[in-house]
């Protein structure tokens, strides 16, 4: 029944937002129609057909079909395990014996499970009314609730049958003591979220309760900000806001569930840490930040330090109340319809007295030029290279942000020509540029590529030459024209995304800048010299970190 509910919810949502589909959503169905003669239907037609089929198919027919597609013959057993000294590997006879035992075993069918349909009783919540209302940026409506929460609403039809929200506060990981950060390493935090659940419901039960609903809600922690974000259909928005409320009012800390999560991580960690990708990440972090204790990478030591009590202590400190909090809600909703839901659920978050503020813990990239060139065992010999350039800026300017985006676009084109087409040394290099505003304005540029061992040193040299050339001589007229046209093309494409407007609202609230308007102005007024200026400012800082991971001699020889 839950599987049917999930499928019906998927096809129902697809039908409602058929008019706002993006091009990429049309590609696969058309390919299937052309090559496999699979029927191409409008989403509304497909939804009606699925409903009819589900009414005609009894559960017994599904069970019979499963039995038919899992016969005793034509069975293949695939076994994968690390090649590790002292690990006893099962034989083919062991697998056959296990299969024979299962065949004659009496396996009881799953028992029907009673799953609650409601996360809470709305009647128990007092809520709080709207204290004030005003017009906001981008056609939004701004409410201030009596509990202090600022609510920014931007209804639109750009993406039908979809609502997204972000409830955020200042603080984030910056407020967590250094000694507690192992409990908030990304894998540990993700495991806690997935297993522990919410209120009186463990994670597995929450998943079952959300069957047939298009709802995704989760608490999050960034470096300087934390909160609860989510998405849903308009029909399921009440459930989404209930969960947002519960992540503040009634979080769940279940030791048994947490232990399960940590044990799962322990089971995969020994093999995971042997992977070249893990070793590369570990060396990269060490090269960028040295032994900064606030920089945590998963390890046995990290898991040993992870503690549910530590998570609970810090979580309750961060997600305690609505003081200083703002929620942006964008998408397909009606303001009058959403009003009682906002007052009931978001208005029931505790008021609080003093807003939290982030702290600058000085997690800065190490100064100077450093090259970390190391070797690891790997089955498929290749060299992985990342070059990181960093600079502190005197001030943040959106024009610099646009110029850096333009620079990465041009570098991608140049590296495709020089590293891939001319040298044949890589499938492609990727560049990424970013300017952060807080805690201090800072620009970072990364160049990343994989290559064959014999070509690595030359490609590193060419990548540096390409960057220096762009900084010194600027882009060609053709490169600049292509780049500006691409940036201009992306503007209207971005504006049909609810997530874009969430970010624009948060940017305006945090920095007082009309991102949408100013970004377009910067693109229109961009000059080649702007690209040179930001690159030269980054290069002038002298902060350059190069990490090169090569295969060891034995692997390379093979």
Question: Where do the model's predicted regions map?
Answer:
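M16 family metallopeptidases and their MPP-like homologs
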Residues: 1-55, 75-81, 152, 159-250, ...
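Proteolytic maturation boundary segments
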Residues: 2-5, 32-178, 326-328, 333-377, ...
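Peptidyl-prolyl cis-trans isomerase
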Residues: 57-61, 65, 252-259, 303-306
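Edge/loop elements at the starts and ends of beta-strands within beta-rich repeat scaffolds
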Residues: 69-71, 223, 318-320
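Short amphipathic alpha-helical segments
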Residues: 236, 334-338, 399-403, 407-411, ...
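Bilobed periplasmic-binding protein/Venus flytrap-like ligand-binding cleft at the lobe interface
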Residues: 248, 346, 403-414, 462-470
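Flexible helix-coil linker/hinge segments at domain or subdomain boundaries
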Residues: 254, 351-357, 473-480
């Amino acid at each position: 029944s839950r599987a049917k509910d999930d499928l019906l919810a998927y096809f129902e949502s697809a039908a409602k937002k058929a008019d706002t589909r993006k091009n990429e959503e049309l590609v696969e169905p058309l390919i299937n129609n052309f090559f496999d003669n699979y029927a191409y239907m409008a989403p509304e037609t497909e939804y009606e057909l699925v409903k009819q089929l589900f009414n005609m198919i009894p559960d017994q027919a599904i069970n019979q079909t499963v039995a038919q597609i899992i016969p005793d013959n034509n069975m293949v057993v695939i076994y994968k395990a690390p090649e590790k000294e002292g690990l006893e590997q099962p034989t083919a006879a062991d697998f056959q014996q296990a299969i024979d035992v299962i065949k004659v075993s009496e396996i009881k069918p799953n028992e029907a499970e009673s799953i609650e349909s409601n996360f809470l009783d709305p009647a128990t919540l007092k809520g709080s009314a709207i204290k004030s209302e005003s017009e906001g940026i981008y056609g939004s409506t701004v409410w201030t609730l009596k509990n202090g929460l600022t609510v920014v609403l931007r209804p639109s039809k750009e993406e039908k049958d979809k609502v997204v929200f972000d409830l955020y506060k200042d603080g984030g990981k910056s407020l967590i003591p250094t000694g507690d950060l192992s409990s908030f390493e990304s894998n540990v935090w993700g495991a806690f979220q997935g297993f522990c659940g919410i209120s009186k419901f463990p994670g597995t039960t929450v998943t079952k309760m959300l069957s047939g609903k298009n709802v995704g809600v989760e608490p999050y922690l960034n470096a300087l900000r934390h909160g609860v974000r989510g998405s849903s259909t308009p029909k399921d928005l009440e459930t989404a806001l209930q969960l947002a409320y519960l992540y503040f009012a009634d979080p769940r800390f279940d030791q048994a569930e947490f232990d399960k999560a940590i044990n799962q991580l322990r089971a995969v960690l020994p093999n995971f840490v042997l992977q070249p990708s893990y070793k590369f990440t570990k060396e990269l972090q060490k090269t960028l930040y040295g032994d900064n204790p606030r920089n945590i990478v998963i390890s046995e030591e990290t898991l040993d330090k992870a503690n549910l009590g530590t998570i609970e202590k810090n979580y309750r400190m961060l997600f305690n109340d609505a003081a200083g909090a703002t929620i942006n809600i964008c998408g397909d909703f009606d303001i009058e319809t959403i009003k009682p839901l906002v007052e009931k659920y978001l208005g029931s978050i505790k008021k609080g007295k003093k807003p939290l503020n982030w702290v600058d813990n000085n997690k800065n990239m190490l100064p100077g030029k450093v090259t970390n060139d190391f070797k690891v065992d790997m089955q498929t010999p290749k060299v992985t290279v990342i070059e990181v350039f960093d600079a502190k800026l005197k001030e943040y300017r959106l024009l610099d942000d646009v110029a850096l985006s333009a620079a990465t676009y041009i570098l991608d084109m140049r590296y495709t020509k020089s590293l891939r087409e001319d040298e044949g040394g890589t499938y492609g290099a990727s560049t990424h540029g970013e300017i952060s505003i807080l805690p201090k304005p800072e620009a970072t540029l990364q160049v990343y590529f994989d290559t064959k061992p014999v070509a690595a040193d030359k490609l590193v040299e060419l990548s540096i030459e390409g960057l220096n050339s762009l900084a010194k001589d600027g882009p060609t007229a053709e490169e600049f024209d292509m780049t500006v046209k691409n940036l201009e093309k992306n503007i209207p494409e971005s504006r049909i995304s609810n997530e874009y407007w969430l970010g624009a609202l948060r940017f305006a609230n945090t920095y007082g800048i009309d991102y949408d308007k100013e970004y377009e102005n910067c693109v229109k007024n961009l000059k080649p010299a702007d690209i040179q200026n930001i690159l030269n400012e980054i290069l002038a800082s002298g902060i350059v970190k190069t990490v090169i991971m090569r295969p060891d001699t034995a692997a390379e020889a093979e």
